[in-house]
C-alpha cells in the first residue's frame, strides 16, 4: 500500500440486533463509499475495518468485493469495541471526519469535527434516529497513517482461526496445540485454557 494511498474504513454503527430486522443489502457499504468519493472528490484506493469483532469484520469485505478494491489486513481495535474514540486510528491522532452515514432508507448525513468523542456522540444520535443501525465511512487516512495506526494482520488471522475451528472438531484439549501455535504468531499473544464449558442459552437485549 503506497504511503499516499487514500484509505477509508467502512462499517456499521448501532445495535447489532437491529440489523436482524433491518437487514443490510449486499451493496449498502459500497453505496456509502460511492457517496463518500463524491463528497471528498477523491477516489478510494483501499478500505479498512473499524473492528475485527462482529459484523464490522465483514462489511469492508462486502464493499471491496462490489467495488473491486483491496482490503487492509488489519483493523482499528483487534476485537469488538463500544465507541469510536477507542479505535487505534483515533488514538494515533487520525481525524474521524469527514464522515458520511447512510440509513436503511438511503437517507444520509455528513459529519465534520476534529474531536472523536464529539463525533461518537453525534453519530450515535443519528443511528438512534435512523432506527438503530447505519452504515458509515469515516476516519479517512493515507497509506502511511494506516500503517502507523492499524492493528495488523487481524483479517488474515481471523480467516486462519475460523478455518482451524471448522476443521478441528472435538474436545478443546485436542485443538489447543494448534491454537497455541496460531496465536503465538499473532498480535494476540499466547493462549491459556481457563475453563471448558458449553453455552446452553443466551439473552441479548438492545
Predicted regions and their residues:
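Conserved anion/nucleotide-ligand pocket segment
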Residues: 105-155
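Alpha-helix C-terminal capping segments
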Residues: 39, 59-70
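A short, small-residue-rich loop immediately preceding and capping a beta-strand
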Residues: 43-56, 70-72
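Oxyanion-binding "anion nests"
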Residues: 163-206
Amino acid at each position: 500500500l503506497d504511503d499516499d494511498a487514500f484509505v477509508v474504513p467502512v462499517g456499521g454503527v448501532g445495535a447489532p440486533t437491529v440489523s436482524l430486522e433491518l437487514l443490510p443489502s449486499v451493496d449498502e457499504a459500497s453505496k456509502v463509499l460511492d457517496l463518500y468519493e463524491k463528497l471528498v472528490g477523491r477516489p478510494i484506493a483501499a478500505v479498512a475495518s473499524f473492528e475485527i469483532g462482529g459484523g464490522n469484520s465483514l462489511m469492508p469485505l462486502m464493499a471491496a468485493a462490489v467495488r473491486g478494491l483491496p482490503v487492509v489486513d488489519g483493523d482499528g481495535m483487534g476485537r469488538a469495541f463500544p465507541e469510536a474514540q477507542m479505535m487505534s486510528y483515533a488514538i494515533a491522532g487520525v481525524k474521524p471526519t469527514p464522515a458520511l452515514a447512510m440509513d436503511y432508507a438511503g437517507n444520509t448525513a455528513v459529519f465534520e469535527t476534529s474531536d472523536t468523542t464529539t463525533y461518537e456522540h453525534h453519530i450515535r444520535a443519528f443511528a438512534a434516529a435512523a432506527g438503530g443501525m447505519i452504515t458509515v465511512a469515516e476516519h479517512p487516512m493515507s497509506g502511511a497513517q494506516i500503517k502507523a495506526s492499524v492493528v495488523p494482520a487481524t483479517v488474515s488471522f481471523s480467516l486462519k482461526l475460523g478455518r482451524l475451528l471448522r476443521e478441528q472438531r472435538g474436545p478443546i484439549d485436542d485443538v489447543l496445540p494448534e491454537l497455541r501455535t496460531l496465536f503465538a504468531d499473532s498480535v494476540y499473544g499466547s493462549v491459556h485454557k481457563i475453563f471448558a464449558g458449553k453455552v446452553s442459552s443466551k439473552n441479548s437485549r438492545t
